[in-house]
């Protein structure tokens, strides 16, 4: 009888030690860092159970003890509630923190930078190449985009997307992102339109955006934008053609090869401001906040001309003779730079 009791006692001790070791392993796993060496994007599909999750984490080399992982989920059931989604794991994260993240449903955010001065066609290309975007547009035609966005004025599309870094989660649609950018631009344009200076020669908000887009393409110097705007406003008021190269480039479309010839300037298009009077029918790029502000509040100047000064800025003039001299000065600066 004593031997039996001794054996039972020994078994209980062994089981106790084993249980203690098991619990230690579970706690150790819970507080250990993930095996990854860099940020890792992990997608948990809907309906994934505890076993499947452990196998996926092990297969992706995120954890190394799938069986102990299952013990952890049983011992701490609060950690076994996870939501489908795409998550970002970091090397500093523990297994417990990872499970808490999966429980929270806080999915990874991805950035999409829409830069001012670019066209909608550039943004559509970015969307096609961006990771984890759900593509729903049938093609990249502007008419298709306008229809998908249900625009009240389908022709008001180029230049009508707010340039910013837009954050999104996996499976966000291309249309959803474009709607966000469009909504913010509409709000900004409405504000600029309501607060615009008196007497500006714009027929509607689209002309304001069109002017802002031309300013955006003409100068990258924020402090000059209202002055550049004044040149174009002064020209519009006296019926003088705008004669701005970026409009020619836009009107040429895919024919533009990086260089403009005199023939290009003389070839009529709807956007060629060397051959048309007034503003083109729409924007030629996406304006930023500074250009939109300049279009709504141009400086009051007598200037009708401007040309690059070769130093990053522009020289402004009131008459053609002075302008031509400034052009020659600019060409001289370019020649000296090329000779170096």
Curated annotation (Swiss-Prot):
Q: Which residues lie on this side of the membrane: Cytoplasmic?
A: 1-3
Q: Where in the cell is it found?
A: Cell inner membrane
Reaction catalyzed: a peptidoglycan chain = a peptidoglycan chain with N-acetyl-1,6-anhydromuramyl-[peptide] at the reducing end + a peptidoglycan chain with N-acetylglucosamine at the non-reducing end
User: What PANTHER family would the database entry show?
Assistant: ENDOLYTIC MUREIN TRANSGLYCOSYLASE
The record describes its quaternary structure and partners as: Homodimer. Interacts with PBP1b.
List GO terms (cellular component aspect): outer membrane-bounded periplasmic space; plasma membrane
Q: What does this protein do?
A: Functions as a peptidoglycan terminase that cleaves nascent peptidoglycan strands endolytically to terminate their elongation. Required for normal glycan strand length distribution. May function as a terminase for both classes of peptidoglycan (PG) synthases (aPBP and SEDS-bPBP synthases) by cleaving PG chains as they are being actively synthesized.
**Pfam families reported in the protein's UniProt record:** YceG
Q: Which residues lie on this side of the membrane: Periplasmic?
A: 25-340
Q: Which GO terms describe its biological process?
A: cell wall organization; peptidoglycan biosynthetic process; peptidoglycan metabolic process
From the Swiss-Prot or TrEMBL record, what is one GO molecular function term? lytic endotransglycosylase activity
* Protein name in UniProt: Endolytic murein transglycosylase
């Amino acid at each position: 009888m004593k031997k039996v009791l001794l054996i039972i006692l020994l078994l209980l001790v062994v089981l106790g030690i084993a249980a203690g070791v098991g619990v230690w392993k579970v706690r150790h796993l819970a507080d250990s860092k993930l095996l990854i060496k860099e940020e890792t994007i992990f997608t948990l599909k809907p309906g994934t159970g505890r076993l499947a999750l452990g196998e996926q984490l092990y297969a992706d080399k995120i954890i190394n003890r799938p069986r102990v992982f299952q013990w952890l989920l049983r011992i701490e059931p609060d950690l076994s509630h996870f939501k489908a989604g795409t998550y970002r794991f970091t090397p500093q994260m523990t297994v417990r923190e990872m499970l808490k993240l999966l429980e929270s449903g806080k999915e990874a955010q991805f950035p999409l930078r829409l830069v001012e001065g670019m066209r909608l066609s550039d943004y559509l290309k970015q969307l096609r190449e961006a990771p984890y975007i759900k593509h729903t547009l049938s093609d990249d035609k502007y008419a298709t985009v306008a229809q998908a966005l249900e625009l009240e004025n389908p022709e008001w599309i180029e230049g009508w997307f707010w340039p910013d870094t837009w954050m999104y989660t996996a499976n966000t649609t291309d249309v959803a992102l474009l709607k966000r950018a469009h909504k913010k631009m509409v709000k900004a344009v409405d504000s600029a339109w309501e607060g615009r200076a008196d007497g500006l020669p714009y027929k509607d908000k689209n002309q304001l955006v069109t002017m802002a887009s031309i300013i955006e393409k003409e100068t990258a110097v924020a402090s000059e934008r209202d002055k550049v705007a004044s040149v174009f406003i002064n020209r519009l008021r006296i019926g003088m053609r705008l004669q701005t190269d970026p409009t020619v480039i836009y009107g040429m479309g895919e024919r533009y090869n990086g260089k403009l010839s005199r023939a290009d300037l003389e070839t009529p298009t709807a956007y060629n401001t060397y051959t048309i009077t007034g503003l083109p029918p729409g924007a030629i790029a996406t304006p930023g906040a500074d250009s939109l502000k300049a279009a709504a509040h141009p400086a009051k100047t007598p200037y009708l001309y401007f040309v690059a000064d070769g130093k990053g800025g522009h020289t402004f003039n009131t008459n053609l003779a002075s302008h031509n001299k400034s052009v020659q000065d600019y060409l001289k600066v370019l020649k000296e730079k090329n000779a170096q």
